[in-house]
């Protein structure tokens, strides 16, 4: 089996930065929030994932780090729309409902400032990402 997962929040500012901006204006989702699951970083911890795979019967487990740029939008407006639609920032924004809509202009202004500080090239706004490619064999 081979799968790819995100590494830590710190290794993936393209997802974590936007959430940090949104949390300056909105509360984090509560325990009963309708979230999208354990989150994109739930398998970032190599020792924990290795142990889970071993318990499931996998052997010859390898982790290979892959760092790569990711396009978050062709324009700042595209990037803001992307960040508020998916991922950790989008989840906080959706869960806040009318409170988020009331603060949308402030949030978008703050997010635009953060996004404008990122690298830009001919394709758009580029940010760093980091993943694990995890492989293992299950002899059974």
Label every model-predicted segment.
Residues 1-6, 41, 110, 114, ...:
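Amphipathic alpha-helical hairpins
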Residues 2-74:
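Conserved catalytic/acceptor-binding region of the Class I
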Residues 15-22, 49, 53, 79-83, ...:
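Hydrophobic alpha-helical core bundles mediating ligand binding, dimerization, or RNAP-core interactions
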Residues 28-35, 98-102, 138-140:
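Intrinsically disordered, low-complexity coil segments
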Residues 38-42, 102, 131-135:
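Amphipathic alpha-helical surface "interface" segments used
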Residues 56-59, 76-89, 127-140:
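Core SAM-dependent methyltransferase catalytic element
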Residues 62-121:
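C-terminal helical/coil "lid" or tail adjacent to the Rossmann-like core of SAM-dependent
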């Amino acid at each position: 089996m081979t799968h790819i997962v995100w590494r830590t929040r710190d290794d993936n500012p393209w997802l974590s930065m936007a959430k940090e901006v949104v949390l300056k204006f909105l509360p984090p989702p509560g325990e009963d929030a309708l979230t999208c699951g354990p989150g994109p970083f739930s398998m970032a911890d190599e020792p924990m994932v290795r142990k889970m795979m071993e318990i499931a019967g996998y052997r010859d487990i390898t982790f290979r780090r892959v760092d790569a740029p990711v396009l978050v939008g062709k324009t700042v407006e595209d990037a803001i729309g992307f960040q508020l639609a998916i991922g950790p920032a989008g989840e906080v924004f959706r869960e806040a409902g009318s409170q988020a809509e009331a603060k949308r202009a402030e949030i978008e202004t703050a997010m635009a400032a953060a996004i404008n500080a990122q690298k830009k090239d001919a394709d758009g706004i580029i940010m760093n990402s980091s993943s694990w490619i995890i492989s293992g064999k299950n002899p059974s």
